[in-house]
Curated annotation (Swiss-Prot):
Gene that specifies this protein: rpsR
Family (UniProt): Belongs to the bacterial ribosomal protein bS18 family.
Assigned keywords, A-Z: Ribonucleoprotein, Ribosomal protein, RNA-binding, rRNA-binding
Subunit structure, interactors included: Part of the 30S ribosomal subunit. Forms a tight heterodimer with protein bS6.
Cross-referenced InterPro entries: Ribosomal_bS18, Ribosomal_bS18_CS, Ribosomal_bS18_sf
One Pfam family linked to the record: Ribosomal_S18
GO CC, any one term: cytosolic small ribosomal subunit
GO MF, one example: small ribosomal subunit rRNA binding
Organism in which the protein naturally occurs: Protochlamydia amoebophila (strain UWE25)
HAMAP family the record matches: Ribosomal_bS18
Top-level taxon of the source organism: Bacteria
GO biological process, one term: translation
Function: Binds as a heterodimer with protein bS6 to the central domain of the 16S rRNA, where it helps stabilize the platform of the 30S subunit.
Name listed for the protein in its UniProt record: Small ribosomal subunit protein bS18
Amino acid sequence: MLQRKPKYNSDYSDARSKKRKRCPFTAAGIREIDYKDIDTLTKFITERGKILPRRITGVSAYHQKKLTAAIKRARHVALLPFVAEV
C-alpha cells in the first residue's frame, strides 16, 4: 500500500514562522523622513539605485510612502543618482 505524504512540510512552516521585522523609523521614533539625510536614504536603495520594497526592509506602509517621496525628492535635487554607474 502507498504511504501518504504529510499535507504540510514541517520544515516549510518553521521557515515561515520568522519574527516580523519592526519598522526602523517607528523603533527610533522618527515621524518625518528628511530628503537631505542621504545616509539614511541610501540604506533603503539598492546599489543600482532602486528603492527596496517593504517586505525586504520591514518599513511600515506609512513610512514607506514617506521614504519613497523623500528618495524621489533627493533625486530631483541631485543628492541621489537616478541610476548607478555601470
